[in-house]
UniProtKB/Swiss-Prot annotation:
It holds the Pfam family Tryp_alpha_amyl. Disulfide bonds join C41-C93, C55-C81, C63-C125, C82-C141, C95-C153. The lineage of its organism: Eukaryota, Viridiplantae, Streptophyta, Embryophyta, Tracheophyta. It comes from Oryza sativa subsp. japonica. It comes from the Eukaryota. Belongs to the cereal trypsin/alpha-amylase inhibitor family. This is Seed allergenic protein RAG2.
Length: 166
């Protein structure tokens, strides 16, 4: 009977400790906004509806140059693109903005959002090259993205998944 009281007391102490720690953390983070990507990283909220127009031009030029970093892109255009990407205030939203931009490029060209990576979306530019150029822009621009590896957006690893347009 005494051992049950000890176990019960220990469990009660653990529960009270967890609740106290949770309350302390909630109080500590009360001024910070914590959200999932889906709540904030939407066109018109986390980034503009027509996102990154200068980056669209960079991606198209890189694609025709078959993704060579800096290939066929003049310095002013690169700087403009990098400023636009860095201006997406929430670094968590940068890959979402680039994904939305790629969907916009496809719509502008009359291409579907999904297709084979080797399919051309415009002369000299294959779908896979376009997506690779877009996903690599954070590394190209040296801007922080917490949701990718080596400055490359996470969605590049899923080239055959449907694009949501945001």
């Amino acid at each position: 009977m005494a051992s049950n009281k000890v176990v019960f007391s220990a469990l009660l102490l653990i529960i009270v400790s967890v609740l106290a720690a949770t309350a302390t953390m909630a109080d500590h983070h009360k001024d910070q906004v914590v959200y999932s990507l889906g709540e904030r990283c939407q066109p018109g909220m986390g980034y503009p509806m027509y996102s990154l127009p200068r980056c669209r031009a960079v991606v198209k030029r890189q694609c025709v140059g078959h993704g060579a970093p800096g290939g066929a892109v003049d310095e002013q255009l690169r700087q403009d693109c990098c400023r636009q990407l860095a201006a997406v205030d929430d670094s968590w939203c940068r890959c979402s903005a680039l994904n939305h931009m790629v969907g916009g490029i496809y719509r502008e060209l009359g291409a579907t959002d999904v297709g084979h990576p080797m399919a051309e979306v415009f002369p000299g530019c294959r779908r896979g090259d376009l997506e690779r150029a877009a996903a690599s822009l954070p590394a190209f621009c040296n801007v922080d993205i917490p949701n990718g590896t080596g400055g490359v957006c996470y969605w590049l690893g899923y080239p055959r998944t449907p694009r949501t347009g945001h």
